[in-house]
């Protein structure tokens, strides 16, 4: 039953009808599970209970042709749990990777065929396991998570464009009009990352100093509306880099908090 299962492994639940990590909960023990049922009452029937998977999210994003084959594909990585980001326990941070691993590409292309993703944007999500999980796989294995027949949300398409020096919307328009890309695909392969700050928190490097230090790398620094700010941050920074070390240095500067 649910209670005996919760003693053996961490659980999480998500709304049967919802968007992203909104309305998700994680349970580490029977007490937390009981509290959830008491709070939700009959509404608990509107949730799906699942085993919690410790993994980073890797995606397969792009535009498919009439044969469900990618005209262009790229991948972005979210190292921390989206649920923990949404609940304010982790800062918003994710990045477009310059390359797609052969395993991820194989699984992504197979999913496009299986779901008949013809002549459309696609946004496929996978877990890359951080630790071995009985019955699921070993650390580093990739597992299917979610299929979306639409572009990735937020500023992700812009980030894909910055990372590759292309226009994914133009590629989509070419697909609609001609069935193939008539404009350049990726001109280069860079990292493009997104970091989010909350106004109520203090950070080691002030906003203006961060903008000045990374002015040659920043693509955009948008403010988010209140409806999105709780999960993603009030202030976003989107920047591109040639190598991972430079990107990680930016992450530290953008998200480091004052030492206690």
What are these regions (language model features)?
Residues 173-260:
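Peripheral (often C-terminal) accessory segments that flank ATP-dependent C-N-forming ligase machineries
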Residues 6, 16-17, 85, 228-232:
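Short, flexible turn/loop "capping" segments at secondary-structure junctions
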Residues 20-21, 55-57, 189, 231:
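Short acidic/glycine-enriched loop/turn segments that link adjacent beta-strands
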Residues 11-26:
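Conserved anion/nucleotide-ligand pocket segment
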Residues 1-10:
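Single conserved hydrophobic/aromatic residue that forms the stacking wall/gate
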Residues 51-117, 121, 128, 132, ...:
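ATP-dependent carboxylate/phosphate-activation module, predominantly the ATP-grasp catalytic core
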Residues 7-8, 27-31, 206, 243:
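Alpha-helix N-cap recognition
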């Amino acid at each position: 039953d649910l209670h005996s299962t919760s003693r053996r492994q961490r659980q999480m639940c998500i709304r049967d009808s919802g968007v992203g990590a909104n309305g998700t909960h994680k349970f580490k023990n029977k007490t937390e599970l009981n509290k959830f049922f008491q709070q939700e009452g009959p509404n608990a029937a509107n949730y799906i209970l699942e085993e919690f998977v410790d993994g980073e999210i890797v995606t397969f994003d792009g535009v498919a042709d009439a044969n469900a084959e990618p005209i262009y594909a790229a991948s972005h990585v979210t190292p921390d749990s989206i649920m923990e980001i949404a609940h304010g326990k982790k800062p918003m941070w994710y990045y477009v990777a310059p390359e797609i691993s052969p395993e991820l590409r194989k699984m992504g292309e197979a999913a496009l065929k299986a779901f008949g993703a013809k002549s459309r944007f696609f946004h496929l999500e996978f877990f890359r396991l951080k630790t071995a999980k009985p019955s699921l796989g070993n650390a580093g294995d990739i597992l299917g998570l979610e299929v979306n027949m639409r572009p990735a949300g937020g500023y992700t398409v812009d980030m894909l464009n910055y990372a590759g020096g292309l226009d994914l919307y133009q590629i989509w328009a070419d697909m609609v009009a001609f069935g193939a890309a008539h404009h350049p695909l990726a001109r280069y392969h860079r990292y493009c990352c997104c970091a989010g700050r909350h106004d109520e928190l203090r950070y080691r490097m002030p906003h203006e100093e961060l903008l000045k230090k990374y002015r040659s790398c920043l693509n955009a620094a948008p403010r988010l509306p209140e409806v999105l700010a709780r999960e993603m941050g009030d202030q976003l920074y989107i920047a591109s880099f040639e190598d991972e070390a430079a990107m990680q240095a930016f992450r530290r500067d953008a998200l480091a908090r004052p030492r206690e």
